[in-house]
């Protein structure tokens, strides 16, 4: 018994000496803040969404062109994503918080983040009315000179909160009954699309107060052909696609809004074969080349927001299709970087298992059997040639529904 205790004591002593020697050479890692390079020209991109089923912790993730995760932002309950400044190294997020996590007093803020460190710089309180929606484009927009941020509200009464980013203060709230999705059209002019097919034109003065407001005559019939609100801008032109697979070009500026042109995205034969628009954020525009990218699939017309399998590319001048890009996975959202050598980004749903096993699960359990296995991934393509470049299959769990080039 005594010898056994002595052996234990010697063993403990040797471990203490060994660990002491190891600790003597140990240099603790110092916590710090990484600083990102300039994002311009890097083909970096963000993805964001509600982070379902954990909607109280909305997320936005930053990736580089090689698929490396560079950072993330936690953007409050049911993220509406980010608004990216082109003039300042700043990012803006309209965020919702509750004093007890999922209950209690609600507070809405515009959070301003440093684009190099992703650290919060300051908050601007706004009315606790910010709209939350699956389609997040047009819910928060910058004026062209980036002085003001406009935030869409829904209580269910519709209104706009005006925020002065220079003075870091809430200016005022403007009712816009029956209208939604905001589109900037100059330093002080904005439009919101309305349920009757017209637009609400809002003009601000230099302090951010309302200088004038008016409703336009209807430009389209929403009962015959409903425009999707995910518009894309090129100068003073905005491009939309409709539920019946048409493209619309609208000119918006300080003088007013006017329909410029419209054309069909599909031929009669393609329409009869079931081809149509797809996805939650299924359109993108490369401004320099004038190319419109539209996510498409074969399905029933009423399923126009289900995932897509191809991206069709159109010349907005000739209104002709230039290419069809077959996707590796089913996509819910696309984005296209600007400048030379653009990238096409596809935010996809996938089952990370062999295809035969996936087919067996679908045949035996249908959509309900596949749903628990679904994960999200990203695929990158050369937007000029359609060549697949790489896949990013290991993105965090949670429903992401926007991919946005930075």
Q: What does each model-identified segment do?
A:
Residues 2-10:
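Bacterial N-terminal signal peptides that target proteins for export
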Residues 23-406:
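Predominantly soluble domains enriched in secretory-pathway, periplasmic, or organellar proteins
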Residues 18-22:
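N-terminal signal peptide c-region/cleavage motif recognized by signal peptidases
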């Amino acid at each position: 018994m005594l010898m056994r205790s002595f052996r234990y004591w010697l063993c403990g002593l040797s471990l203490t000496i060994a660990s002491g020697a190891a600790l003597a050479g140990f240099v603790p890692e110092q916590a710090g803040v990484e600083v990102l390079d300039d994002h311009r020209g890097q083909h970096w991109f963000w993805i964001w969404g509600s982070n379902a089923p954990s909607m109280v912790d909305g997320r936005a993730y930053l990736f580089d062109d090689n698929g490396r995760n560079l950072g993330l932002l936690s953007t409050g309950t049911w993220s509406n994503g980010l608004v990216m400044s082109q003039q300042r190294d700043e990012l803006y997020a309209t965020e919702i918080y509750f004093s007890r996590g999922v209950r209690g007093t609600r507070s809405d803020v515009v959070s301003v983040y440093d684009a190099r460190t992703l650290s919060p710089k300051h908050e601007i309180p706004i009315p606790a009315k910010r709209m939350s929606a699956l389609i997040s484009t047009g819910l928060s927009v910058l004026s062209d000179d980036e002085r003001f941020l406009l935030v869409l509200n829904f209580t269910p009464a519709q209104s706009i909160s005006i925020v002065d980013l220079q003075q870091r203060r809430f200016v005022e709230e403007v009712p816009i009954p029956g209208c939604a999705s905001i589109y900037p059209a100059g330093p002080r002019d904005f439009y919101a699309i309305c349920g009757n097919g017209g637009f609400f034109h809002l003009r601000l003065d230099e302090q951010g107060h309302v200088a004038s407001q008016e409703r336009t005559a209807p430009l389209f019939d929403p009962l015959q052909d409903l425009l999707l609100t995910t518009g894309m801008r090129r100068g003073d032109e905005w491009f939309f696609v409709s539920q019946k697979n048409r493209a619309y070009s609208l000119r918006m500026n300080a003088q007013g809004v006017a329909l410029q042109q419209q054309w069909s995205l599909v031929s009669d034969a393609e329409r009869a074969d079931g081809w149509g628009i797809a996805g939650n954020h299924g359109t993108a525009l490369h401004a320099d080349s004038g190319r419109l990218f539209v996510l498409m699939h074969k399905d029933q017309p009423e399923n126009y927001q289900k995932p897509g399998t191809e991206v069709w590319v159109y010349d907005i001048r000739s209104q002709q299709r230039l290419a069809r890009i077959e996707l590796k996975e089913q996509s819910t959202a696309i984005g296209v970087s600007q400048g030379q050598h653009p990238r096409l980004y596809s935010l996809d749903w996938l089952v990370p298992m062999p295809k035969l096993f996936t087919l067996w699960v679908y045949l035996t359990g249908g959509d309900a059997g596949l749903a628990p296995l679904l994960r999200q991934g990203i695929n990158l393509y050369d937007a000029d040639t359609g060549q697949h470049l790489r896949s990013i299959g290991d993105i965090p769990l949670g429903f992401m529904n926007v991919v946005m080039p930075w």
